[in-house]
Regions:
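Intrinsically disordered, low-complexity segments enriched in Ser/Pro/Gly/Ala and basic residues
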Residues: 1-2, 268
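ATP/NTP-dependent adenylation/nucleotidyl-transfer catalytic domains that generate, transfer
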Residues: 201-271
């Protein structure tokens, strides 16, 4: 599913998004925008609001207050006003995102957020998040530095099964600069999370220090990294198919046959 066509930066318009939702993604019982109030989710929400009469399912938004920033209550109110102006139902949630020992604040917030949202989405609902191509490049680099294989280097898929339905990222083929330009051209307002500027988090360090230096030397690097992630996703799909076939070949009566398994080349056994 990660190799589905992506909405391209040159096609950041409602019609292109509608085609992706209608023809390339599963048909859900409802579309739910994960709306933080930030730039990316604001653009996604407005794009979908323009499409609402033509969507195959009802459109709603969900905002999660992690209670990690002093302005979080104001951000929730901002999201309420935006959704009210667009006449989009908004579900506001508040979670305890305090990290456990050894857990990063970002990981704790992400886990709490998805757990809370999962509680209110029904079967076959689709959660839409606003990650874009620059986020994909950051994810690829983070996985590379962790020594990931092709599964991890696939980075983020356009759509995957999640919580009795799906999680989709319809802007994954769009550059951050295109999203900002679209928002500014339409006079949209959004909130700025100061934690996104802090250099302590690994992703922020990549975003503000590493990737700009890479792009200064190789201007097409972000697009190239996205292509590499797509190649890895294809390779991961093939390896999963191979592993399924190998498992059948080395199994007898639903049990692994050790002799057959050991006869395989090491790389195929590890797979």
């Amino acid at each position: 599913m990660s190799s589905l066509p992506e909405l391209q930066a040159s096609a950041l318009d409602p019609q292109a998004l509608l085609e992706q939702l209608d023809r390339q993604l599963p048909r859900p019982t409802g579309y739910w925008v994960a709306f933080s109030g930030g730039l990316d989710s604001t653009v996604l929400l407005h794009l979908l609001a323009m499409l609402r009469p033509r969507l195959a399912a009802p459109l709603s938004a969900v905002h999660v207050d992690h209670a990690l920033q002093t302005d979080s209550v104001a951000w929730a109110e901002h999201c309420r006003r935006v959704c009210a102006a667009l006449d989009i139902p908004l579900h506001s949630l508040r979670v305890d995102a305090m990290p456990r020992q050894g857990e990063s604040p970002e990981a704790a917030a992400r886990q709490a957020r998805y757990a809370a949202v999962a509680q209110i989405l029904g079967p076959r609902a689709m959660l839409l998040t606003a990650q874009h191509r620059d986020d994909q490049a950051e994810t690829l680099l983070l996985q590379m530095f962790r020594g990931a294989g092709v599964e991890g280097l696939s980075a983020m898929p356009v759509v995957r099964s999640w919580n009795r339905g799906w999680l989709a990222r319809p802007l994954l083929g769009v550059r951050r600069a295109s999203i900002r330009a679209w928002a500014e051209a339409r006079g949209l307002n959004w909130v700025e999370d100061p934690s996104n500027m802090a250099g302590v988090a690994d992703r922020n360090y990549l975003r503000h220090q590493v990737i700009p230096a890479i792009v200064a030397r190789w201007p097409g690097a972000v697009d190239s990294m996205a292509r590499s992630a797509a190649h890895c996703a294809d390779a991961a799909d093939m390896l999963r198919s191979l592993a399924d076939r190998e498992l059948r070949d080395v199994s007898v009566a639903d049990r692994l046959e050790q002799a057959r398994l050991k006869s395989r080349p090491p790389a195929r056994s590890r797979n």
